[in-house]
Amino acid sequence: GAERRDHVERWSLGSVLALWAVDALAGLFGPALGAGAGAGPLGWVLSVLTAALAGLAAAAHIWRWWLWQPRRTTAVPLVWVLHLAYLWIPLHLLLRVAAEFGGLSPSLATHALTVGAIGGMTIGMMTRTARGHTGRLLEADHWEVAAYALIAVAALLRVGLPLIWPAALMTAVLLSALAWAAGMGIYSWRYWPILTRARIDGRPG
């Protein structure tokens, strides 16, 4: 089954906390230092430190994700959707490394986190908690799987398409928004009647 290793947990958390601290410094002093591509010496050091911490955090979170053995959850949509969403966190961090030196737009890293990780976690947990708290089995049918897939496609379109074809940015934004709306629309259509009625097991709540 899934493994938990304390040193991996420490590196996963510690590297991200350190990255956040450097982000805070960059926010406070970056404009004065000229941080980023073409920066002065101090700004360049800040960019290198940011990229190094983002790379370290990405490696730690990929390792952590792999220890969970996500390949064994492919038959359980309520679980694999969370593993898939989590994978966007190290992808976000790797994109930050590239963005730090002007290799690509920082917006791609941001959307890997927001659309991919947060969007996927949100749709996964909304379905899981809605089913659990209304007395239903923790099972996902083809409608839930379709919603999960559409949110994943939205992330791939928003991040992947501009990455390989920068001129298609606006097309990527439009297609991603449509996929997102469709995925959340399926959730709303499926779960409105579930969430506005009493529990099916007769228990309060």
Segments from the language model and where they lie:
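Hydrophobic alpha-helical transmembrane segments of multi-pass integral membrane proteins
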Residues: 1-205
